[in-house]
């Protein structure tokens, strides 16, 4: 994306690490059958699209997974903060999802985050989401370094 420097990307991803973890923390605290059903459906679709190697739909499922967690958190300010940050990093996120090895890791990480939220384990959900976002940051930084 034009206007995003390596320094900007680091800043954005560092902020996302904190806020995404917080979103998952609150989602686990506010867990509902409806929210879990939405996440489970997204995970099932994500696994389906992974098997089909459909990068565009995988990116959409990745977006939806994080959006639903934001909704489940019950804190509008979390969504209001994260949506613009996701938009700013879309190009790098899309390239990252196109990498089969990274996508397999994303699917596993999303499943673990879901399990923690479903169990109501807020601390574990936050830690797993933070770790997931750190991995995304590393992948994006690698893409930026190698492809500009």
Label every PLM stretch briefly.
Residues 1-17:
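HTH-adjacent hinge/linker in prokaryotic transcriptional regulators
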Residues 134-144:
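Short arginine-rich
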Residues 26-34:
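A eukaryote-biased feature capturing mid-to-C-terminal, repeat/solenoid-rich segments of large proteins
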Residues 5-6, 92-96:
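Short alpha-helical transmembrane interface motifs in multi-pass membrane proteins
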Residues 3-7, 108, 127:
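Charged, amphipathic alpha-helical coiled-coil/dimerization segments
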Residues 117-120:
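Short acidic-aromatic low-complexity motifs
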Residues 12-18, 33-94, 109-114, 124-135:
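Conserved amphipathic alpha-helical segments that form helical-bundle/coiled-coil interaction surfaces
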């Amino acid at each position: 994306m034009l206007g995003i420097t390596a320094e900007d990307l680091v800043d954005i991803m560092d902020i996302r690490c904190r806020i995404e973890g917080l979103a998952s923390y609150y989602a686990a605290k506010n867990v509902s059958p409806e929210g879990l059903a939405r996440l489970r459906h997204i995970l099932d679709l994500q696994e389906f699209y992974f098997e089909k190697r459909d990068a565009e739909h995988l990116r959409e499922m990745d977006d939806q997974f994080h959006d639903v967690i934001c909704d489940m958190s019950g804190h509008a300010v979390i969504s209001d903060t994260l949506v613009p940050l996701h938009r700013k990093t879309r190009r790098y996120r899309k390239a990252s999802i196109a990498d089969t090895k990274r996508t397999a890791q994303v699917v596993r990480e999303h499943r673990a985050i879901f399990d923690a939220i479903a169990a109501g384990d807020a601390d574990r959900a936050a830690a797993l989401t933070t770790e997931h976002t750190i991995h995304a940051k590393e992948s994006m930084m690698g893409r930026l370094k190698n492809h500009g």
